[in-house]
Amino acid sequence: MRRDSSETKRKILTVCVRLFLEQGYKNTSVSQIVDEAGVARGSYLNLFPTKDRILLELTETMFGGQFGVARSIAHSKLPPVYAYAVETAIQLTLTELNENLREIYIEAYSLPETSEYIYLHTTAELKQIFGENFPDDTESDFYEMEIGTAGLMRSYMARKCDIHFPLERKLSRFLTAAMRVYRVPEEEQAKVLAFIQSLDIKAIATEVMYKLFAMLEMKYDFKLSKNGEMEETR
C-alpha cells in the first residue's frame, strides 16, 4: 500500500512540476493534474489537499542550491555580502526571463507554508553573511528581518521591468534597500553594486534557469516542451 502511495505521489509531482513550468501555476487545474497523472481525484486529495502543498515540494527543490551558484560566481576572496547580492540578483532576473517562473516565485513568497519555508531556509544564510553587523542578534532576529526583505523581494519580482524601470535599476533598488536593512556600510554597498553591474546577469540567470530546468526534469522524470520553454524565454 505504501509503495502504491509513493508511486501515486511521484506521478502527481512529475505532472505538476512540468505543467507549472509549461503553462503556469494558476493555469494548472486539479482536473488536468489527475487526468495527466492517471490517478484518482481522491488519491490526489489524500496526498495533496491543496495545490499549495505541491508548490512547497517544488519550492524546496528550487531554493536548495541557489546560494551554491552564487558563491561560485562571487568567489571566496570577496566578502559574503557579494554572494547574497549575486543570489538575489539572479532570482530577480530569473523572473524577468520566464513568466511562469515569476508566477511560481511570487506564489512561493505569498503562501503561508512556502513563505515560511523560505524564511527558515534563508535565516541561517543571513546570519552567516551579516552576523558581524549584528553581534548581539540571534537567528530569531534574522528571521524577523528576513520577513521584511522577503517582502521587498516579492514586490520587486511582481513589478515587471519596462523601459521606465529596467532590470539594472530594479536590481540596484532592491539591493540598496536590503543592504541597508543588514547594515552594510554605504561605501561597501557601492562596491557591491558596481560588482553586480560588471556581470552579465541575464546570461548568468539564463544558464541558471536551464540548469534548474534540467535538474527538475531529472528529479521528477519528465521532459519539458521545448516550444513552450523557448516561447517563455525569448
Where would I find each of the regions flagged by the language model?
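Amphipathic alpha-helical packing segments from all-alpha helical-bundle domains
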Residues: 109-161, 165-176
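Short, hydrophobic secondary-structure boundary micro-motifs
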Residues: 102-107, 187-191
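Short alpha-helical functional segments enriched in proximate histidine and acidic residues
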Residues: 19, 65, 69, 94, ...
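Helix-turn-helix
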Residues: 11, 19-53, 57
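Hydrophobic alpha-helical connector segments
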Residues: 57, 68-103, 111, 119-123
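C-terminal peripheral helix-coil segments that are non-catalytic and often amphipathic
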Residues: 128-132, 162-234
